[in-house]
Amino acid sequence: MEKPLDQRRFIWIIDDTDKIVHVNDAWLAFAGENTAPQLTANVVLDQPLCRFIQGQETRYLYQQIFSRVRAGVSPVKFPFRCDSPDCRRFMEMKLSLLSGNAVEFISHLLREEWREPLDLLDNSRDRSGEFLKVCSWCKRINIPGQGWGEIEDAIEPLDLFGHHTTPRMTHTICDSCHDAVKLELGLE
């Protein structure tokens, strides 16, 4: 029997200086359920959001999004992925302007695809000094000479099972996700 789709809304708010000032109970529960139990209210509140965003390109794009939302392009919606070792999670995020230049984030699950667990996505695994580029939005891996593909498609060409230690992942944004976000923001 298929598991019912999670209907919760995961909400967090940043103030005008981009510090996290609110996370709802659903957000905290989701973090605890999905390989990030360390993300408690005590850890995330009053911290700059950029502390929790990996990759220079991704941080820069979020800054562009915040600027556009604060300039009146609100709400902004875009799809993203929030995968775990055993599940692809397709989600949507909506950013809306609140009073005082605060920004509210509301994300929700669109669909899930369950799979065999992948060590590459297990945060508890030891990591080598090698790096794989992963898109922060769609979670595809950059496969040199082939472009961006699902993690399962990258296993053989990148010899991921041949490594004694799992490579580290460095976050960026692929061209198609970058173009989609820019289009949503009216930057094209």
Predicted features, each with a name:
Residues 1-16, 45, 65-71, 97-188:
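PAS-family sensory modules
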Residues 8-10, 14-121:
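Sensory/regulatory domains in signal-transduction proteins
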